[in-house]
Amino acid sequence: MKIINIGVLAHVDAGKTTLTESLLYNSGAITELGSVDKGTTRTDNTLLERQRGITIQTGITSFQWENTKVNIIDTPGHMDFLAEVYRSLSVLDGAILLISAKDGVQAQTRILFHALRKMGIPTIFFINKIDQNGIDLSTVYQDIKEKLSAEIVIKQKVELYPNVCVTNFTESEQWDTVIEGNDDLLEKYMSGKSLEALELEQEESIRFQNCSLFPLYHGSAKSNIGIDNLIEVITNKFYSSTHRGPSELCGNVFKIEYTKKRQRLAYIRLYSGVLHLRDSVRVSEKEKIKVTEMYTSINGELCKIDRAYSGEIVILQNEFLKLNSVLGDTKLLPQRKKIENPHPLLQTTVEPSKPEQREMLLDALLEISDSDPLLRYYVDSTTHEIILSFLGKVQMEVISALLQEKYHVEIELKEPTVIYMERPLKNAEYTIHIEVPPNPFWASIGLSVSPLPLGSGMQYESSVSLGYLNQSFQNAVMEGIRYGCEQGLYGWNVTDCKICFKYGLYYSPVSTPADFRMLAPIVLEQVLKKAGTELLEPYLSFKIYAPQEYLSRAYNDAPKYCANIVDTQLKNNEVILSGEIPARCIQEYRSDLTFFTNGRSVCLTELKGYHVTTGEPVCQPRRPNSRIDKVRYMFNKIT
């Protein structure tokens, strides 16, 4: 049986969850349509998703049509959940990008299409809600050509009045884009030679798989218009990106989920081989796990299975698998261009509204951060505050609602702040000797630090011979330095520097790796005090698309948000602004753009790097360590 995995992507309220329901219903996978309004859909299964009518976590379901099984990935549509989208994209064989006939191409549509193009995923456009009043499809087509791609093939003729009717083209007009994109076909056509339908279909298929051409279909998921035809298109146009014939096992973990009973589930896309119940499988070329329970989606329901084949999405109950873990042979994993998840750039303090629920909150955050790499947390040992780092405002609203709905914990949040970093200002060296007070450890360590250009990261090397200081001691020094780099002089992570282990001494009978591990961060702090550090703040590169009439407003507002515009282009009555902006300003700048353009602007951002800040440094409380803080205090007192 052929197995394909497709994604359903769209801007908020374009109808992707409703489309999923219609595909399941028309294929016979379910006998009754779910409703977004009533909260009975198969994929939006959390209370918050049902209340807001939006998808937040990736939903997975399936249907079978003739000899093809189709796994549907119903992905989120809001910017703050793009991490969920990106993780899901890597397992797709193809995508359906929904566009509302009423709303046209929205900001989020462009962001999603940008990601699909970057990942090289074959994509079909589906114009949804064509039965609504006041639809002008020619305007929608032009919108798609200007904002997404001009390389579209309109596959159907649509009559909106008196009744909506969609029929597949049989005339030559659907082949214009295909012919124009191939010099040989165009020359043949211009010379008056006949073109066979087969060669046109082959050319279309090649360009579709190469993501240089996009078939376009129409319908209404809610009114069940064009859905049967879309099912045929899905099963015939998309190919499975799996290894043919016998091969070793290879699968990739793309989602972690916890059930209401706190069972931990790992979602895995299989790319080759066969996975059997009770198999022992190597994970990321390291430890092995035993498959004790295995599920997959069959006609919209999760069912236990005893084997799964290449192309399938399986769900294992396992406590150790991590996101992006590879089961089996890592060399068989498809080489697809990777989109980096955005980095958490904000942090805040969270506490339970009821102090007695603190342990419940920590347990809940452990589960949530396990399934969402964009949420991280730690507990400040001095203040006992719980510090969260995250991406955006809506993400925090969702986490707050999730804690209340699933874990029954209400929380209070402080105003978020940006996450900074530190870099040494100059070269410096420092040595702490064994048996010289106040050093209580049976170790001597000498370190040097040198600043590096921005974006270099932290580099470490040892000039101490392994013949003199064995590997276990050397590893302990490196571990201690990495720990020390987590908190610089202002309490932020230390980066863009080279740290060299230059001198070490031990006493054979009594010295242990723990002595070196404990002393290393103390030496590092002292050498950083000699060097001094400067504060770095995150900057984002941005590209803004806005209607041309808003050029002056967008340009003039930029300095107010510390944005630096480096390039301006005019294209199709649209202005494209490129530049960079501090991460602390992007949320407000983006919100204002959306407001004064009435939602007609889109702002694409990615982390550019860190720049030196000006003004007073922002400090963060250090996380204490009971084993070394007393020694730190003594050294700080004498230096």
Swiss-Prot record:
Alphabetical keyword list: Antibiotic resistance, GTP-binding, Nucleotide-binding, Protein biosynthesis, Transposable element
Domain tr-type G per the UniProt entry, residue ranges: 1-242
Pfam families associated with the record: EF-G_D2 (PF22042), EFG_C (PF00679), EFG_III (PF14492), EFG_IV (PF03764), GTP_EFTU (PF00009)
One MF annotation (Gene Ontology) recorded for this entry: GTP binding
Gene Ontology BP annotations: response to antibiotic; ribosome disassembly; translation
InterPro entries: EF-G-like_DII, EFG_II, EFG_III/V, EFG_V-like, G_TR_CS, P-loop_NTPase, Ribosomal_Su5_D2-typ_SF, Ribsml_uS5_D2-typ_fold_subgr
CDD domains reported in the protein's UniProt record: Tet_C, Tet_II, Tet_III, Tet_like_IV, TetM_like
Binding site for GTP: 10-17, 74-78, 128-131
Family named by the database record: Belongs to the TRAFAC class translation factor GTPase superfamily. Classic translation factor GTPase family. TetM/TetO subfamily.
Function (record text): Abolishes the inhibitory effect of tetracyclin on protein synthesis by a non-covalent modification of the ribosomes.
Name this polypeptide is given: Tetracycline resistance protein TetM from transposon TnFO1
Lineage, highest ranks first: Bacteria, Bacillati, Bacillota, Bacilli, Lactobacillales
